[in-house]
Design a protein with these regions (language model features):
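Bilobed periplasmic-binding protein-like "clamshell/Venus-flytrap" ligand-binding domains
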Residues: 149-156
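Catalytic cores of eukaryotic secretory-pathway lumenal/extracellular enzymes that build
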Residues: 3-4
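C-terminal cap/loop subdomain of S1 sulfatases and analogous C-terminal strand-loop tails that border
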Residues: 14-15, 22, 27-30, 34-120, ...
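Second-shell loop/turn segments in exported
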Residues: 17-19, 133
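Intrinsically disordered, low-complexity polar regions and short flexible loop motifs
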Residues: 127
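The feature captures the short pre-catalytic strand/loop hairpin that immediately precedes
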Residues: 7-16
Length: 156
């Protein structure tokens, strides 16, 4: 899983490194910039300071969501929600929302690789391009990650 969140150059402040196994998110950008500017962010602000190597190393779970990116329901984002996902360790579970209201399917009628199931499980170390759905082979992992997703954001 190789994805650059962002690239920063700050001599004597940021050590050069390439780390493809740490979980980072766009929610980490604001806390990192605030810490770099000497401002302590509010405790209620989500995300971690990416300059704090211990905090980054400690994180082993991250949640993701995909939306239609329209303004149909800016105050109710679940109305244009396509997926909720959880990465925990080497595993990534993608929970697709079937036929969300106000969202048209992509060309061809399907929005994801496997239209036969709403759940896709990937081993990101063995399959970084997410081509092999392992949900049927690892139902215990699916149950665990699905529960984590629902604890994070339950959708009716």
């Amino acid at each position: 899983m190789a994805c650059a969140l962002f690239i920063a150059h700050w001599p004597r402040k940021i050590k050069p490194r390439k780390d493809e196994r740490q979980l980072v998110s766009n929610i980490d950008i604001v806390p990192t910039i605030l810490f770099a500017a000497g401002i302590k962010p509010s405790a209620s602000l989500p995300g971690i300071n990416l300059l704090d190597e211990k905090a980054v190393a400690k994180r082993n779970t991250i949640f993701l969501s995909n939306f239609a990116h329209d303004m149909v329901s800016a105050t109710e984002p679940e109305k244009s929600l396509w997926t909720r996902s959880c990465i925990h360790g080497k595993w990534k579970l993608v929970a697709w929302i079937e036929n969300p209201p106000n969202v048209r399917p992509w060309a061809g009628g399907h929005r994801h690789k496997n239209p036969d199931t709403n759940l896709e499980l990937f081993d990101l170390l063995a399959d970084p391009h997410e081509t092999k759905n392992l949900a049927n082979a690892h139902p215990e992992v699916v149950r665990d990650l699905a529960a984590r997703i629902d604890d994070w954001w339950k959708v009716d």
